């Protein structure tokens, strides 16, 4: 599925009451709704910036990985750059 700008009816980014992290909701013209957690958007932005600003890199792939040992405040499930 490729989502074009004209496919999007509304995009809302907010920190819901009682939460600490950003949620982003995308509503498409056909009524479908997608809600993204902050970490998902952060990873999307991270990958975008890595490719857009790198002088030769044209692709980056982030793969999901579970970490049993991690720094405080970090989620067990992380998207990490594929080597």
Residue ranges of predicted features:
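N-terminal acidic leader/helix
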Residues: 2-32
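Polar/charged, Gly/Pro-rich intrinsically disordered segments
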Residues: 65-83
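Acidic, low-complexity, intrinsically disordered interaction modules
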Residues: 34-71
């Amino acid at each position: 599925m490729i989502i074009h700008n004209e496919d999007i009816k509304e995009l809302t980014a907010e920190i819901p009451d009682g939460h600490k992290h950003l949620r982003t909701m995308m509503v498409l013209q056909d009524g479908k709704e997608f809600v993204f957690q902050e970490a998902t958007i952060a990873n999307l932005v991270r990958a975008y910036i890595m490719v857009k600003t790198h002088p030769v890199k044209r692709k980056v792939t982030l793969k999901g990985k579970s970490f049993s040992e991690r720094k405080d405040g970090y989620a067990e499930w992380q998207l990490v750059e594929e080597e």
